[in-house]
Amino acid sequence: GVTKRVYSVSKEIPPKIKYGWRAGSETEVWQNVSLDKLGIVNAGGKIYSLAASGNKLVLSTGADKFLFNRATGDFLGTHDMKGVAADGGMTSDDAGNILYANLANPNAEFKVYAAASTDEMPAELLSYTNATGASMGKHISVQGNVKGDAIVTAVIYTWNGAVCKFLRWVITGGVPAKPQMISVTGATAGWNGNGHADVEAYSANPDDPYFLAYYSANALYRVDATGAVTHKIATATWGANSNYNCVDVCTFNNAKYAAIYESQHLTKG
């Protein structure tokens, strides 16, 4: 005889929360990528930053940039900048455009280049003759889409004393306006060249707040559009041995998140 069975398959979508991230729902995609074996070493004078575009993750050490598969962590080789010199910080916007900055001392020309992908030649997005009296270019951040509406920020820093200021460019319809200097008031202190200060806009709306972190204040500050600190959201647990830096803001499942990286600034303790 013949035995016959009929099966029916139905697809069920797991329940999804309406807002934010559910703790424990994350999955580690890859880990243990040995940068040392790739010749990417931690050393003085390096300026580390990350950007993501398409299926690629870009790691910059300043003058040198390296490509990885963002889904697997596989090393893809060096990033060809096609002759464009951008030895400063790097980031990517909400649309996957990559932004590259150069380092600029006082009175030098500060430039930010943009490319839609790692295959495209970076083109100049904005330039500014550095009249701040300090240096700039180590950290840049962006919210929005630089081909449409966005905000680009760049902290300034000095090796002589401390500063508590950053520059802001409002981009409308892909066109950057003249930069505005924002002086932060209400923070614990300023930062110098070792402070690794970073500031990130909440959105592409210039009236929205910013998030700021740096050594050695070691706190996450909420700063309004005028530069006044309104909240001190998080503080370090290691005191002067902490280093708050690398702020980022993103939207996930209808919720806004601000993230910071906390490391040890010193080798003791």
Roles of regions detected by a PLM:
Residues K18-K37, F75-G83, D119-T132, P176-T188, ...:
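Beta-propeller fold detector
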Residues K56-S60, N97-Y100, I151-Y157, D208-A213, ...:
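Conserved beta-propeller blade signature
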Residues S242-G269:
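Loop/turn-rich, solvent-exposed surfaces of beta-rich toroidal or solenoidal domains
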Residues A114-A162:
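Asp-box/WD-like beta-propeller blade repeats and closely related beta-sheet repeat scaffolds
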Residues S34-A63:
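Beta-strand-rich domains and repeat architectures in extracellular enzymes and scaffolds
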Residues V2-I17:
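Extracellular fibronectin type III
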Residues D64-N69, P106-A114, T153, W159-V170, ...:
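Structural motif
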Residues A43-L50, G83-A95, N130-K147, G186-A204, ...:
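Repeated scaffold domains used in trafficking and secretory/extracellular systems
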